[in-house]
Amino acid sequence: VMLSAETAVGAFPVEVVSAMADAALGAEQHPVARTSRYRADREFSSPQEAIALSAMYGANHFPEVRGLACLTERGTTPTMMSRLSSGLPIFALSRRPDTLQRLALCRGVIPLFFDFAAFSPEDLEARTVEFLVDGGFLSRGDFILMTMGSTQGEAGKTDLMKILPVK
């Protein structure tokens, strides 16, 4: 959705932007907008892309999943995820403010500060789920699809995907 100069700087700019936001949100609720054929006929270019798009496919086809938790350094994986239409939130969890700022522009992505490097690999899944429950994003009994890299703290190394119950 794009504004022309006349509507963007007219007498009622706030009302115009509000009406356009309502129209965009309404369009995204249409069933056609919730399914995607993005890259359906092409091969993946990297393991990271395979995980990102497979996670979206899995989450969209498993009704108990209430969102995706993506542990990220640079934000590449949640950016790839946002290219697929979905009614599910993509929680981009990062310890880097610059990454979170960039991800704020991606459709369906909720950027959240989370210093996952502060946790041991054994505690990471439980702490991530706990963080999202405490933030009011998830409830007990939900499922969350989580992506991360097996080598914690390295950018561009997303290679794990898990579906976790929220206990």
What is the predicted role of each segment?
Residues 1-9, 37-41, 84-88, 110-116:
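Short beta-alpha connecting loops at secondary-structure transitions
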Residues 3-5, 27-40, 65-66, 139-142:
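Flexible, glycine/charged-enriched surface loops at secondary-structure junctions
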Residues 5-9, 39, 72-76, 93-98, ...:
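Short, ordered loop/turn segments at secondary-structure junctions
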Residues 7-30, 162-163:
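C-terminal helical cap(s) of enzyme catalytic domains, especially alpha/beta-barrels
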Residues 19-55:
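Long, charged amphipathic helices and adjacent flexible linkers at domain junctions
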Residues 49-65, 124-136, 142:
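Phosphate-interacting basic helix/loop segments used at nucleotide- and nucleic-acid interfaces
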Residues 79, 85-124:
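Nucleotide-binding motor/catalytic cores of P-loop/tubulin-like NTPases across gene-expression machines
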Residues 110-113, 126-131, 158-167:
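Beta-strand/loop-dominated core regions that host nucleotide or nucleotide-derived cofactor-binding catalytic loops
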